């Protein structure tokens, strides 16, 4: 599984790199604080379908990086051609 640090993600965003950002936390967590992207709670990840025309990397995040790893493992089985990245240690560093 590929990981990306928060500083690497910020660099990609500053460079204007095309990517998809997915938050797999629950709705209340997302509403309280998020770094953008699409909310797809871990409990609903089986409903997600990637856009066939979008081949950009998918950055998946949660609070500490555990739920995002689970989501990526499941999605990688279903969508092996997509380049998934786990946000290392999640967004917990931003919550403190």
Give residue spans per PLM region.
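Rhodanese-like catalytic fold shared by cysteine-dependent sulfurtransferases
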Residues: 1-20, 24-57, 66-96
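Short, surface-exposed ligand- or partner-binding patches at beta-edge/loop junctions that are enriched
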Residues: 61-62
């Amino acid at each position: 599984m590929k990981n990306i640090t928060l500083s690497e993600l910020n660099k990609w965003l500053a460079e204007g790199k095309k990517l998809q950002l997915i938050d797999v936390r629950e709705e209340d967590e997302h509403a309280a604080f998020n770094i953008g992207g699409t909310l797809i709670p871990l409990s609903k990840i089986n409903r997600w379908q990637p856009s066939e025309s979008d081949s950009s990397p998918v950055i998946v995040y949660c609070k500490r990086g555990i739920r995002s790893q689970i989501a990526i493992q499941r999605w990688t089985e279903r969508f092996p051609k997509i380049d998934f990245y786990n946000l290392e240690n999640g967004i917990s560093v931003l919550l403190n």
